[in-house]
Regions:
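Long amphipathic alpha-helical segments
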Residues: 1-61
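A short linear hydrophobic-aromatic micro-motif
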Residues: 65-66, 125-127, 277, 405-410
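Conserved PLP-enzyme active-site core in the AAT-like
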Residues: 105-314, 318-326, 356, 434
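Long amphipathic N-terminal alpha/beta scaffold segment
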Residues: 44-86
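Conserved PLP-dependent catalytic core of the aminotransferase class-I/II
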Residues: 316-317, 321, 325-373
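Conserved C-terminal alpha-helix-loop-beta "cap" of PLP-dependent enzymes
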Residues: 349-431
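Glycine-rich phosphate-binding segment of PLP-dependent enzymes
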Residues: 31-32, 36, 72-73, 82-104
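Short Gly/Ser/Thr- and Asp/Glu-enriched loop/turn motifs at secondary-structure junctions
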Residues: 6-7, 70-74, 283-286, 382, ...
């Protein structure tokens, strides 16, 4: 192609407008860059079609645009699909976000939510920020301070999703990491014999992996006395946000897959000064990082300059308020995550059979498993009957994902699997229609 034959930016953008429903500014930018790339390729002797470049790029962008999907993977808290289905998302156009209706003056953001959380878990005070990594960053910066020394077991120097590592987060917060113990064995004496003084003691629940065999650690129940002997506050990062290890909202008591999860209330009862946890994992709420504990420590966190950079907005406040009100009123079992997690296998089997029959698809009902997900309860699953679709794994998966709305299934061992435990019953008809179109 001669460079003089390349289309104008407006002409190419106009052609793309008929295929892609995106703002014209994005069409113009994409067209201009595609033409520039095509011109360079032509001059180097490898001509390419700018229309093809632009279309490929817009297809990729369009597929990444936020949209609703049906999660049929069986991973209940699927990080890539938004984790916990949330409640209470209706937010008025204007609200009393930071307005005191009694005095007509500026109020404190999240005042009701903070009081609700504290009373629900039995803490003196509470604070909510944008996510749990942010809560930990803030706790370290506020309670240990710049150049403060923070002791943590080597076996808990975790890496979370996206290659974010605890030592890096600690360094960014301005504190110095004091490693104690070994990867597989840490004792209380390792903390108390660490050289020098420490400004805080941190314990992190390894919620996304499991270490077995010749191991030893200091349980949450013993850490407060260790920290007290060092004259330092104890920060407990329990991660997944299980409010009560007894799970009183689950009929018949806590299921086996919760056996190793620390409870927020129990960790507070042990004497932790600050307990940190996520809002969108086992709690079943929106993305948030929650800090509960002693009023003095929480106030220091709230007054730290970085707290403003981590604060939450109105929709998050509304959703998290609805979530904690469900716990406070004894209605936690109705939260979408717990409804999915505790649904009897027989109910899932009945729904799956009905979907299979309605779709007319050739598939088999087999024994399978669901995962709580979101880096919680590693290695533990929930028994679940699933629909197995054999043959042409990629074709089946792609067909479901191309449906509107997309139905996201699991795929492995040459087959696609549809797991209705992670699907709301109201979406069963969507799954059936998607299966019928394979």
């Amino acid at each position: 192609m001669d460079p003089r034959d390349l289309p104008s930016v407006d002409a190419l953008a106009g052609d793309l407008a008929g295929e892609f429903d995106v703002p014209r500014s994005l069409l113009i930018t994409t067209a201009r860059r595609a033409i520039d790339e095509a011109r360079e390729a032509t001059q180097s002797g490898s001509p390419v079609d700018p229309a093809t470049i632009a279309a490929d790029r817009l297809h990729a962008l369009a597929s990444s645009r936020l949209r609703g999907v049906v999660n049929a993977t069986g991973v209940l808290l699927h990080t890539n699909l938004g984790r916990a289905p949330t409640v209470g998302a209706d937010v008025p156009r204007a609200s009393n976000l930071e307005f005191d209706l009694e005095t007509g003056t500026r109020g404190r953001r999240s005042a009701y939510l903070n009081a609700l959380i504290a009373s629900t878990v039995g803490a003196e005070a509470a604070l909510v920020v944008n996510n749990n990594a942010g809560a930990l960053f803030l706790a370290l910066a506020a309670l240990a301070g710049r150049d403060g020394r923070v002791a943590v077991s080597r076996g808990e120097l975790i890496e979370i999703g996206g290659s974010f590592r605890l030592p890096d987060l600690m360094a960014a917060s301005g504190v110095h990491l004091v490693e104690v113990g070994t990867t597989n064995r840490t004792r209380a004496s390792d903390f108390t014999s660490a050289p020098g003084t420490v400004e805080a003691v941190l314990k992190v629940h390894p919620s996304n992996y499991r270490v077995e065999g010749f191991t030893e650690d200091v349980p949450f129940s013993e850490m407060p006395s260790v920290a007290e002997s060092l004259g330092a506050p104890f920060i407990a990062d329990v991660g997944s946000g299980l409010l009560d290890s007894n799970a009183p909202w689950v009929t018949g008591g806590p299921p086996a897959w919760l056996a190793d999860e620390p409870g927020v209330q129990q960790t507070l009862d042990y004497g932790a000064d600050v307990v940190l946890f996520s809002g969108d994992k086992l709690l079943g709420g929106p993305q948030a990082g929650v800090a509960v504990g002693g009023a003095t420590f929480i106030e220091r966190m709230a007054m730290h300059p970085i707290a403003r950079a981590l604060r939450i907005n109105s929709p998050t406040i509304a959703m998290l308020t609805a979530t904690f009100e469900a716990y406070a009123s004894g209605a936690a079992a109705s939260l979408p995550f717990w409804t999915m997690a505790t649904a009897p296998a027989e109910v899932i089997e009945t729904r799956t059979t009905a979907v299979l029959e309605a779709s007319g698809t050739a598939g088999a009902l087999v024994d399978g498993a669901s995962l709580p997900g979101a880096g919680s309860v590693p290695g533990l699953t929930i028994p679940t009957p699933v629909l197995r679709l054999d043959g042409r794994e990629e074709h089946v998966w792609r067909s479901l994902a191309d449906f509107e709305p997309p139905v996201i299934a699991a795929r492995r061992d040459g087959a696609a699997f549809v797991n209705l435990r992670s699907v709301h019953p109201d979406e069963d008809s969507i799954v059936a229609a998607a299966l019928a179109g394979i």
